[in-house]
Amino acid sequence: MIFKLLKLMSWFTAQCRKQFYNLVFSTQFRYFGKGCTIDISGQVKLGKNIYIGDHVTLIVEQGACLEIADDSFIGESCYIKCFGGKIEIGRDVSINSKSYINGCGGVCIGDNTRIGTQSIIIASNHKFGEPDILVKDSITKQGIILGENIWLGARVTVLDGVKISSNSVIGACSLVSKPLDTSGVYVGVPAKKIRAL
C-alpha cells in the first residue's frame, strides 16, 4: 500500500511539474523532467509534445535563441547552451543522454536526426599560432549544420564549421572536423567515408 501511495505521489509531482512548464512556455510537453536547470534571458520557441529528460540544462543567454520543433526528445543530463548564437532543433529529433551542444556560432539540426549518447557539438573554436594574439582572444564562430535524417552514434564529436549532408550515419566515437558534402557512412578520427548511402 505504501509503495502504491509513493508511486501515486511521484506521478502527481511529475504532472504538476509538466503543467507548470506548459504554462511558462505556452506549449504542451510530453514530459518535463525533475532537477532541470533552466536559465533563459534570450528567445525560446518550443513546439508541442517535446520530451525534456531529468537533469537537463537549458541556458539561453541574452541575444541568443533556442528553437525546438514538435515531437523532439532531449535525454537526461543533456546540456544545451546558447550564447550569442541560435540553436535550431528540428522536428522529431532525438538527442540522447549526457550530450552537450554549444551554440555559440549557431547550430541547426535537421528533422528526424538521431544524436547518440554523450555526443558533443561545439559551434566555436580557438585560433592559435599567432604569437601576438592570445588563444582565449581569438575565437571563430562558423556554425554547424546537420541535415535531415542523420544518425550520430554514441560519443561523436562535431566541431565548428561542419556541415553534414542529410541521410548520413556517423559511427560511434568519430570526430567530424570538416564538412561531409555527400551522404554516406563515416567513421574514425577524423571521420572518413566508408560507404555510400
Task: Locate predicted features.
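Extended, small-residue-rich solenoid/repeat segments and analogous flexible loops
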Residues: 1-51, 57
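Flexible, glycine/small-residue-enriched loop-and-beta-strand segment within the central core
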Residues: 41-44, 51-160, 189, 197
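Short alpha-helix at the nucleotide-sugar/activated-sugar donor binding site of glycosyltransferases
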Residues: 114, 168-169
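A generic "structured core" feature
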Residues: 151, 169-175
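Short beta-to-alpha loop/turn elements within the nucleotide-binding domains of ABC transporters
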Residues: 162, 173-174, 180, 189
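Conserved catalytic segment of ABC-fold P-loop ATPases
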Residues: 165-168, 181-183
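Conserved beta-strand-loop-alpha-helix hinge in the C-terminal portion
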Residues: 182-196
